[in-house]
Each structure stands twice: as C-alpha cells, then as structure tokens.
Amino acid sequence: MTFQNKKILVAGLGGTGISMIAYLRKNGAEVAAYDAELKPERVSQIGKMFDGLVFYTGRLKDALDNGFDILALSPGISERQPDIEAFKQNGGRVLGDIELLADIVNRRDDKVIAITGSNGKTTVTSLVGYLCIKCGLDTVIAGNIGTPVLEAEWQREGKKADVWVLELSSFQLENTESLRPTAATVLNISEDHLDRYDDLLDYAHTKAKIFRGDGVQVLNADDAFCRAMKRAGREVKWFSLEHEADFWLERETGRLKQGNEDLIVTQDIPLQGLHNAANVMAAVALCEAIGLSREALLEHVKTFQGLPHRVEKIGEKNGVVFIDDSKGTNVGATAAAIAGLQNPLFVILGGMGKGQDFTPLRDALVGKAKGVFLIGVDAPQIRRDLDGCGLNMTDCATLGEAVQTAYAQAEAGDIVLLSPACASFDMFKGYAHRSEVFIEAFKAL
C-alpha cells in the first residue's frame, strides 16, 4: 500500500488519530486533521507535533469536499453516516489504523494473534501477551487494550516482532479488510454498542471480520453466534464451559481439560470466576496455535494475576467482601461476573446503557442477588427491565450511597459487587474513575 502524495484526512484526534497522522506523513502522504470539536489548545498541542498540519472542524462533509483520496477514521467515528457513504461512492477509500498495520505485518510476515468479543477480550489479550513474553517471544501487545498499533510500530522502529497480540473492538474491525491473523478468536457475543449497529446479528457479523484469511479459529462452543462463525476448510479449536470440546471444563472436578487430558485445576488459576476459566482456555488455544509449548503455558497461567477493575477483590469489612468489576460495561460482562461468584450478592448496576436490553440479567440475578442498587442515567430502564422478578431494588443518587446502603444490608459471607452493565460517562471520567470512587467509598465505611 503506497501513500506517496495521497491526500488523506485523519478524522478523530485521540491517540489513534495522532498515530495515523505520524505514520502517514512519514510515508509521504499529504495529511490533514479533522475533529468535530476542536479547542484552540488542542490545535496548538497537535500543531507543535506536526509542522504545517491543516485542521478542519465542524461538519465532516465540508472537510471531505476538499479533494481527499482517503479518509482515515479513528474507531470512535462510525463510517455508517451519509457523508462517508457519499465519499466512498465518489471513489474515496475509508480505512483505520488496523488496516494500516495489516499492510505492515503482511509485508514482514509477522505472526498475529487477534482477539475480540463482547467480554473478556482485554483479559485474554493481556494473558496471551504475558504467556508469549514468558515463553521468550518478542511480543507486541497493542490495539484496543491501550497502545495504538501504529504507536507500537513507531516505537519498534520497523523491527520485526515474533508476534503481535492485538485486542480489536468491533469499531476497529469495521474498516479492516487485509488483516490475516495467524490465530484469532471471538470469545462471545452479547448485547453491546447497539446504538451503533442495526441489531445483534449486524454486530456479530462485524466481529466475524477478524477471521479473514486462513489462520486458526478459536471459538466458543457455548455461544450460538460464535458457532456460526466457523469457516469451511479452517482449523478450529473449540472451548466450552458446558460440554466436552477441544478445551473444556469438567465441572465436577474443576479441571480444565484438552480432550481427555487434564490441563489445570481452577484452584491453580489466580483469575476468579468461571468466565475466566473460559478466558484461560481461549488463551492457551491461541498460544498453542503459534507453536508454544502447552506445558510451559500452563505453568505461566498460574502466575498471571489479571487486570484491575475486572472481578477484582478490593477488600473485606466485617466478613463482607467487596469486588470491583467496573469494566463490566455491558449485560454479558455483568452476567458472567455474577455467574462466576458463589456467595450471596448485593449488586450495583447502572450508568449509560448504550441501547441495551437488561432483561437477560433477570436470570443471572434471581436466586443469587439479595439486593440490587441502581445508579446513573439509565437506572429507570434497568428497573423496568428487571421489574416483576422478585428482586429487591433500591435507587441511589451516587455510587457512594449505593456502597453504604449495600453494606448496611449485607451480612458476613456476602459480596458487594460493582458490575454496572453500563458505560460510566454519565457520572465518571471512565470505568477506572468509577472504580476509584467505589474503592474510596469502601475505605470510608
């Protein structure tokens, strides 16, 4: 792919957008920058990084009318809007940073492990990266997990990697056509981002774009959407919490197995919850697909401590355990967190619902939750969706109030779980900030 003298508009000026500007300018493109809202201080900051960079703001259509060949989109901007559709119909090309990286790794023949799914993808990406590093591979961990892929490539100064471990969101996959992972997984599909997609099937089809090429597919046998993603003629590794598969959990003994062979007992896995047993199986399958030793992988699984804000115990007071799952930003994540915990629960839900249907939480909560505490802008919708199933629900003005009220009702042996099933931006700067407030409220008890 050549960009010499191509006129390219980079839309969205966060970390991904900045990395695309740097990469494209280095490769000879004539680059301009666009954001719907641009504050003078941001223009000044970016302008110091890139001499002579032209900025556009306001309507995207007005910017695109300036004769651009390519529109490079940051993940937060959907290409499903009339201005972009018209740009494509007039011969313009739309791509993102993953498509740019695909061109690089394809030319170098770097191995790629690609990971997506509604829930668990950050944990699995981190675990796969950790296992690859522990097994001695020169490993790059990038993508939706935090470091933009082109920033990671820039830092390596063009040096070939043994393996790229990429966390990819559905947004990043929308305009990715050339990535051919050595091994890839869709961990699961549940309602998320339905404010951006037509329906759940549309969302699942976007996720399935991760399986372009002929690499190994690692698929969740318990998920109907994932089962439908199997491609003819491809090597597939199935994992399951429900029945025998290539990788599966024997519930009676708590053993993870590969076929008939014992792999590891769940007690030896630091990650809590049944959903993390599935994450471990997916990670081991992905790593085996690039030739890593199963024996070494299982030893290193025992030392992986997981990530903050994902079903993480933050403390205990008078026998009541407090668990932070602030990263549980959709219904599927919260249902998985609840299913993976055995003790009686008081669950804090709420925030920005992103168009989700919360009724699937009814089955997850009934019989396990002694109380539900609702916060945030979509608390009324959650109450409506859960109404009538016998749950004791309490509306709280703040997260701190929810923590205090839950603790007042809890007994020794109970768990207070923050797993909101919602985004956080109505009340917090992000899920990490929401977690900080939760921890502060716990410490104040």
UniProtKB/Swiss-Prot annotation:
Residue sites binding ATP per the record: 117-123
GO biological process: cell division; cell wall organization; peptidoglycan biosynthetic process; regulation of cell shape
GO MF terms held by the record: ATP binding; UDP-N-acetylmuramoylalanine-D-glutamate ligase activity
Gene3D superfamilies attached to this UniProt entry: Mur ligase, C-terminal domain, Mur-like, catalytic domain, NAD(P)-binding Rossmann-like Domain
GO cellular component: cytoplasm
EC number(s) stated in the UniProt entry for this protein: 6.3.2.9
Reactions it catalyzes: UDP-N-acetyl-alpha-D-muramoyl-L-alanine + D-glutamate + ATP = UDP-N-acetyl-alpha-D-muramoyl-L-alanyl-D-glutamate + ADP + phosphate + H(+)
Localization, UniProt: Cytoplasm
InterPro entries cross-referenced by the UniProt entry: Mur-like_cat_sf, Mur_ligase_C, Mur_ligase_C_dom_sf, Mur_ligase_cen, MurD
Pathway(s) it belongs to: Cell wall biogenesis; peptidoglycan biosynthesis
Alphabetized Pfam families for the sequence: Mur_ligase_C (PF02875), Mur_ligase_M (PF08245), MurD-like_N (PF21799)
Keywords assigned: ATP-binding, Cell cycle, Cell division, Cell shape, Cell wall biogenesis/degradation, Cytoplasm, Ligase, Nucleotide-binding, Peptidoglycan synthesis
HAMAP family, per the entry: MurD (MF_00639)
Family per similarity comment: Belongs to the MurCDEF family.
Protein name: UDP-N-acetylmuramoylalanine--D-glutamate ligase
Organism in which the protein naturally occurs: Neisseria meningitidis serogroup B (strain ATCC BAA-335 / MC58)
Name of the coding gene: murD
